[in-house]
Amino acid sequence: MTTEITRPPAPPSRPSESRKPSLPGLLHLVAIAAVLATIVSAWAIDFVPTALIDGSDNIVALLQRMIPPRLDDPARIGMLAVETLLMAVLGTTLAAIASVPLAFLAARNTTPHPAVQAVARAVITFCRAMPDLLFAVLFVRALGIGVLPGVLALALHSIGMLGKVFADAIEQTDAGPREAVRSTGVGYFRELLNAVVPQVVPSWIAMFVYRIDINLRMSVVLGFVGAGGIGFALQDALRGLIYPRALGIVCVILVIIAGMELLAIAIRRILLDPSRSNPLRDRIARFGLSGVLVGSCVAAFVLLKINPLALFTWVFPSVGIFTRMVPPNFDALGVDLFTAAAQTVAIGVVATAIGIALSIPAGILAARNVSPHPALYWPARAWILVVRAVPELILAVVFVAALGLGPIAGTCALAIGSIGFLAKLVADAVEEIDPGPMEAVRSVGGGWWKTLFAAVLPQSMPALVGSSLYLFDVNVRTSTILGIVGAGGVGYLLFESIRTLNFDVAGAIVIVIFVIVYAIERLSGWIRSRLV
């Protein structure tokens, strides 16, 4: 009796902790669900390994027909390459300009009203959920063939990413500087400019540079729908079955994207990791890079022959196209629409599963602190870079030519493309782990494999799961546009409805795509919040 009276009470947090599933338990549940979803999805699209084995001869034959690569008109290809680069820079810059005020309205700690925050968040979510190629198709239909639809498509889709990241950065700022500035009696805008902006500029710059890198890859494929860039020449070569010319253009694209990635690394180092020994040099470099950005945007308007007024006048003809999509017509396609939508999700699931299986080994070998030998590290890094340089839509064209029309070609394209995305994230996550556990395992005689399974994977597992879920989100979004080249999914129905001017049917398909992408994004985000 006395023992019970003197026993200290249990902490109040204990019951809630006991009800919360452990991290290993959640990982097991997610793994089981992923395996079941992969099996069901593979069955739904008739994806079997024997299909790849049977089609391997066709793939090899197609690659042999591409060799040796050639450039029939180097001057024209060079101009299209410059056009592609300028489209990416201008589109990203316009998106950043639009995202800054939108982010302040969407951030919880800077929005003037909850209703304004909800509207701003809805705009950002819509731009992120709609694929850029879909925006490009609609703008080409509204404004005609040219680079302006491509620039606008890149800008609108980029708002979805930049706006969200910018708003998240604002919400994570320290409130202390704002209170100090507010105490001096300055207004609302001066408060934001003096107290919030200095805290978020580094993360904004990093994301802006990263988005240019992404948009350069995206601008390559916009030419497939007549939205300018080097993709138009690539599509022309593939349509004419001139495969050596197509491979030559792909090599040019590889050089451009690889160069841009190296330049982005250098820019981030200059802007975000200033040298303590020579601050004057860093200041000059920053002003110089700012001048290069402004000069590139001016050059984009001149060389791309874009009237600056078109940035404001595009709204009216585009609204005319969008209004023709309302009310949406779900009856025209009937059950075929939802069958194609289910196929889109299945393609994303299977491609993600294969991509994870291929990306984790490549990412581990590409991690400098874990790779067993430089002879494995550098080829792994090069392989990741090469795969990242080739957009999934181009891979889909190759697999359609080798394996035929259908979801299998789209699944293979997304699976290979996933390596460039996920393997890099895996390598970055592994390089950031604590070296202490690795040294402890090695100190007791543990070899490379023992170190990998006992020290590396346990530390990096949450990041691997989070990146894999994000890859699934990206793959489902990308699979919605692969239908443009006959690689399965709902994209084929969408582009056919737009081509035949059935905009009410296109409106129904757009709504279905939005619901799918938004639901997947929310689901993966919820799982990441539980695991990471």
Swiss-Prot record:
Region (Disordered): 1-20
NCBIfam families xrefs: PhnE
Subcellular location, principal: membrane
Bilayer topology annotation: Multi-pass membrane protein
Database matches in InterPro entries: MetI-like, MetI-like_sf, PhnE/PtxC
PROSITE patterns attached to this UniProt entry: ABC_TM1
Entry keywords, A to Z: Cell membrane, Membrane, Phosphate transport, Repeat, Transmembrane, Transmembrane helix, Transport
Function noted in UniProt: Part of the ABC transporter complex PhnCDE involved in phosphate import. Responsible for the translocation of the substrate across the membrane.
Protein's UniProt name: Phosphate-import permease protein PhnE
Molecular function in Gene Ontology: ABC-type phosphonate transporter activity
Quaternary data: The complex is composed of two ATP-binding proteins (PhnC), two transmembrane proteins (PhnE) and a solute-binding protein (PhnD).
Keyword Transmembrane part of the UniProt annotation: yes
Similarity remark: Belongs to the binding-protein-dependent transport system permease family.
Induction: By phosphate-limited conditions, via derepression by PhnF, and probably also via the two-component regulatory system senX3/regX3.
Keyword set includes Magnesium: no
One GO cellular component, as annotated: plasma membrane
Record's subcellular location: Cell membrane
Record GO biological process: phosphate ion transport
TM ranges: 23-45, 85-107, 134-156, 187-209, 216-235, 245-267, 287-304, 345-367, 395-417, 452-471, 478-495, 505-527
Lineage: superkingdom: Bacteria
Residue span, ABC transmembrane type-1 domain: 81-264, 341-524
